[in-house]
Amino acid sequence: RPCYIVSVGNYKTELKAADFETAFAPLEKEAEPTMIVIPEAVNLADADCYALQQKMVEHCNKMMSRISILDVFIDKYPANPAVKVDYVDKFRNGFSTNFPSYAAAYYPYLNTSVLSDTDITDSMIVLKDNVTDFIMHIGWEEAMIASFTAAFLKEGSSGEMTKDINQALLQNSVVYQQLIKAVKYDLNLLSPSAAIAGVYCSVDNSRGVWKAPANVTINSVVKPSATINDYEQEELNVPITGKAVNAIRTFPGEGIKVWGARTLDGNSQDWRYVNVRRTMIYLEQSVKNA
């Protein structure tokens, strides 16, 4: 099954919501995509993330051949970590659409094992940016950031020199070890939408589009970033507003599973389930293209 990747910029430039919105026009010319995923949307401010997600759903309604997989925005670097925030409630209040059956939302983020220590130290740009974020978050001075960058992350440094410095620091510097550990944790804490797209494809291939993409294990995940119990699951799945959010949960002896397959149109008798909406899309497009 092909995957269409639409470039909206590069890794050195901070992207804005408007940059991501340029991806929709090229996709309107393509008939094959059956789902839209923008995992990077959560890197925007919360309001911009919700606005971009609304554009995703509008695009899906316009095309009538695909569905949006959305992440519930979580602030990875809150101004006051001691204050508990209900991000699901913020999502329900901040995101709105007239076409809820064309979207499904998932929560929480996933602590993954995708990147190793070697993957992190091999990427100078990523290391520089994330070390800077981490140092700023814990309150160190900008002068220390500049010193760290000048000493260890110079453009044009040879691979062997960088490797030697990295090994020396890992063996002798507790602070550096903590930085690498923090960067590794940060980079491996991923929003779930990309993984959920993989779950959809896996279920499509093994069973069919009519099968609910739920009760399915996700690979390369250590644990969800939040623990959800049965009571919280019920509130996520069947809210009064109908904006259902699908949970990702850990079950003893079974591992980590996607536990829900509802669209954001939870109060609809016809379109509350992802597999029903996607099956109808499949049938409509099959007839249209016959």
What feature does the model see in each segment?
Residues R1-A290:
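A glycine- and small-residue-enriched flexible loop/hinge signal that marks low-structured segments
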